[in-house]
Swiss-Prot record:
Belongs to the GTP cyclohydrolase I family. QueF type 1 subfamily. Its main location: cytoplasm. GO terms for cellular component: cytoplasm. NCBIfam families: QueF-II (TIGR03139). One of its GO terms (biological process) is queuosine biosynthetic process. It is found in: Cytoplasm. This is NADPH-dependent 7-cyano-7-deazaguanine reductase. Substrate binds at V62, E63, L64, H81, E82. The active site is at C40 (thioimide intermediate), D47 (proton donor). The gene is queF.
Amino acid sequence: MRYGEKEIKEFDVENMEIWPNDAKNDYIIKITLPEFMCCCPRSGYPDFATIYLEYMPDKFVVELKAIKLYINTFMYRNVSHEASINEIYNTLKDKLKPKWIKVVGDFNPRGNVHTVIECCSDMVVPK
């Protein structure tokens, strides 16, 4: 097993590295993760997406290698588009406790269907 595979397989989300946010100003962090992959829970075929993460930190920020490793843990998991984005959103919201957070998964088309999943802490439900 190569070192990257080992890091991904051994990554424990409970120990995700987060750092203190010492900034006094409110600001937005935007992270793009263009190589997300998970496996369809029905067929096992791979699904690919770009994940867009935006958040306004409060006391903590996520370390960039930690978020990369966490996202890569989905690579061999059988999980739906909806479940994967909701899990990422909930994990980061629980770990970082940001003032505001949004996670978007823009999935590559498969079978002529393009899916975008969005979770946001200030989501307004359309009527």
